[in-house]
């Protein structure tokens, strides 16, 4: 009998486990991989399959998991007691649509791809398993076959000696018709060494009911690897980063050392981009053509224009840089900062919510916050925009072609008019007129007969 074609897809993600070996009070599915929770990776894959519903079964940690990942398209189902994967699916059963298929994913298997899920779902069988062959299958449920047909999955602790020699193992990921799940799940029991309700027992039920059980064997062990310890988490992090680096190299990005780059979000690159060692990219980052990133830079939610260079140890967060800018080393650009073409921001300069127009330079040891800087402005070393009175923040405006001498304090709200020059060491509290020299400093004088104090002998 041919199997029906289902237009609806339910996805159930099992995410109730404690993860004892993580040695953490945090549910293991909330630990970060590449900058986002492990469970978020699984949710992202699930959403790409366009299911009619996503059901997440959670348990350990209580409401921490749904609170950490709020979303309108998720049905959260609590497994109050963690009594096994079969018990978890029993909790999800009332939310499954009768005329749909269900894809069962694991919340601690973050590298599974959409392609593998699709391959599983296209199998014409009431039940289909995703399996993998392991050199060391210890701890995994063994796939027991009769010829090519899957007859059962035997958990490691329940396996006979001959079954322990089997290398093909269950990944825990499967797809099934909901009409059959409604028949099999209520029949599960906990008569086994672990006294848990094994979801894998539905394989034997399917065979007993005369239903063929299909299996798709993955050739990528990492793609189906779960996280049970910090060692597992660290290993998968390096796999993820290594694969991301390989994709960047394939696009033509030059990486000084592919093993020393971390992407914790999405990195979009143009042509002839160069990235030195130790760089971290977080959130949504875009690097246009011919961008050069020096060693140990951290870039978060930023757009870097063509031809721009970031020297070593530069931090960019929530900023937009236009073309041919020169930044760093040791510069920090905070959220709201926008640089126009050919801006220069030098060492130990911090910008926050500052707009710097084309050709302007802030080359040394300065803080410019809540400021608008015009074209061709030069801001000397040690300049500070004093933007905060302890309660409110105020804005500084520096118009085109102004020159700010070193060690100046601009007390906002204040405007430095076009072409104005501020003498070094000035504290400016009022607007400075255009094309004039403004200064505010104590007159220098010398005490002729002064002597240094002498040390008192005790």
Curated annotation (Swiss-Prot):
Reactions listed under catalytic activity: alpha-D-glucosamine 1-phosphate + acetyl-CoA = N-acetyl-alpha-D-glucosamine 1-phosphate + CoA + H(+); N-acetyl-alpha-D-glucosamine 1-phosphate + UTP + H(+) = UDP-N-acetyl-alpha-D-glucosamine + diphosphate
Uppermost EC category: transferase
Ranges for region N-acetyltransferase: 252-458
Originating organism: Methylobacillus flagellatus (strain ATCC 51484 / DSM 6875 / VKM B-1610 / KT)
Family in the record: In the N-terminal section; belongs to the N-acetylglucosamine-1-phosphate uridyltransferase family.
Organism domain of life: Bacteria
Region (Linker): 231-251
Database matches in InterPro entries: Bifunctional_GlmU, GlmU-like, GlmU_C_LbH, Hexapep, MobA-like_NTP_Trfase, Nucleotide-diphossugar_trans, Trimer_LpxA-like_sf
Function: Catalyzes the last two sequential reactions in the de novo biosynthetic pathway for UDP-N-acetylglucosamine (UDP-GlcNAc). The C-terminal domain catalyzes the transfer of acetyl group from acetyl coenzyme A to glucosamine-1-phosphate (GlcN-1-P) to produce N-acetylglucosamine-1-phosphate (GlcNAc-1-P), which is converted into UDP-GlcNAc by the transfer of uridine 5-monophosphate (from uridine 5-triphosphate), a reaction catalyzed by the N-terminal domain.
Subunit structure: Homotrimer.
Subcellular location, record wording: Cytoplasm
Protein name per Swiss-Prot or TrEMBL: Bifunctional protein GlmU
Residues engaged in binding Mg(2+): 108, 228
Keywords for this protein: Acyltransferase, Cell shape, Cell wall biogenesis/degradation, Cytoplasm, Magnesium, Metal-binding, Multifunctional enzyme, Nucleotidyltransferase, Peptidoglycan synthesis, Repeat, Transferase
GO biological process, one term: peptidoglycan biosynthetic process
One MF term in the entry's GO annotations: glucosamine-1-phosphate N-acetyltransferase activity
Annotated spans, Pyrophosphorylase: 1-230
Obligatory cofactor(s): Mg(2+)
Pathway: Nucleotide-sugar biosynthesis; UDP-N-acetyl-alpha-D-glucosamine biosynthesis; N-acetyl-alpha-D-glucosamine 1-phosphate from alpha-D-glucosamine 6-phosphate (route II): step 2/2; Nucleotide-sugar biosynthesis; UDP-N-acetyl-alpha-D-glucosamine biosynthesis; UDP-N-acetyl-alpha-D-glucosamine from N-acetyl-alpha-D-glucosamine 1-phosphate: step 1/1; Bacterial outer membrane biogenesis; LPS lipid A biosynthesis
GO cellular component: cytoplasm; membrane
Transmembrane segments: none
Cofactor: how bound: Binds 1 Mg(2+) ion per subunit.
The enzyme's E.C. designation: 2.7.7.23, 2.3.1.157
Residues holding UDP-N-acetyl-alpha-D-glucosamine: 14-17, 28, 79, 84-85, 141, 155, 170, 228, 334, 352, 367, 378
Active site: 364 (proton acceptor)
């Amino acid at each position: 009998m041919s199997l029906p074609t289902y237009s609806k897809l339910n996805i159930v993600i099992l995410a109730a486990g404690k993860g004892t070996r993580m040695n953490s009070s945090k549910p293991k599915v909330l630990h970060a991989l590449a900058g986002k929770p492990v469970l978020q990776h699984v949710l992202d894959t699930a959403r790409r399959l366009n299911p009619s519903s996503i059901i997440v079964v959670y348990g350990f940690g209580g409401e921490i998991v749904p609170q950490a990942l709020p979303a309108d398209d998720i049905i959260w189902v609590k497994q109050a007691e963690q009594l096994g994967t079969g018990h978890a699916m029993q909790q999800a059963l009332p939310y499954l649509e009768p005329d749909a298929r269900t894809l069962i994913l694991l919340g601690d298997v973050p590298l599974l791809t959409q392609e593998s899920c699709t391959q599983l779902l296209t199998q014409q069988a009431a039940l289909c398993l995703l399996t993998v062959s392991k050199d060391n299958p210890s701890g995994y449920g063994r796939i027991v076959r009769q010829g090519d047909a899957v007859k059962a999955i035997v958990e490691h602790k329940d396996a006979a000696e001959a079954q322990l020699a089997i290398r093909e193992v269950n990944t825990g990921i499967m797809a099934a018709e909901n009409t059959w799940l409604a028949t099999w799940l209520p029949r599960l029991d906990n008569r086994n060494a672990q006294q848990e309700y094994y979801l894998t027992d539905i394989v034997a039920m399917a065979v007993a009911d005369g239903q063929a059980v299909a299996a798709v064997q993955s050739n990528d062990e990492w793609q189906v690897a779960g996280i049970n310890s910090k060692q597992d988490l660290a290993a998968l992090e390096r796999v993820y980063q290594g694969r991301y680096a390989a994709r960047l190299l394939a696009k033509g990005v030059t990486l000084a050392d592919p093993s020393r780059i971390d992407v914790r979000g999405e990195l979009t690159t143009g042509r002839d981009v160069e990235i030195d060692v130790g760089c971290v990219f977080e959130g949504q980052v875009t690097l246009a053509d011919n961008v050069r990133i020096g060693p140990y830079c951290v870039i978060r939610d930023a757009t870097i224009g063509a031809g721009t260079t970031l020297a070593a140890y530069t931090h960019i967060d929530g900023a937009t840089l236009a073309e041919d800018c020169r930044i760093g080393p040791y510069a920090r650009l905070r959220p709201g900062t926008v640089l126009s073409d050919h801006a220069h921001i030098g060492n130990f300069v911090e910008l926050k919510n500052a707009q710097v127009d084309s050709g302007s330079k802030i080359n040394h040891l300065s803080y410019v916050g809540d400021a608008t800087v015009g074209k061709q402005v030069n801001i000397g070393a040690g300049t500070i925009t004093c933007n905060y009175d302890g309660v409110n923040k105020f804005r500084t405006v520096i118009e085109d072609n102004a020159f700010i001498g070193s060690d100046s304090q601009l007390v906002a709200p204040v405007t430095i008019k076009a072409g104005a020059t501020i003498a070094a060491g000035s504290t400016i509290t009022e607007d400075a007129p255009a094309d004039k020299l403004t200064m505010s400093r104590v007159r220098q004088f010398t005490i002729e007969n002064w002597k240094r104090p002498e040390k008192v002998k005790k």
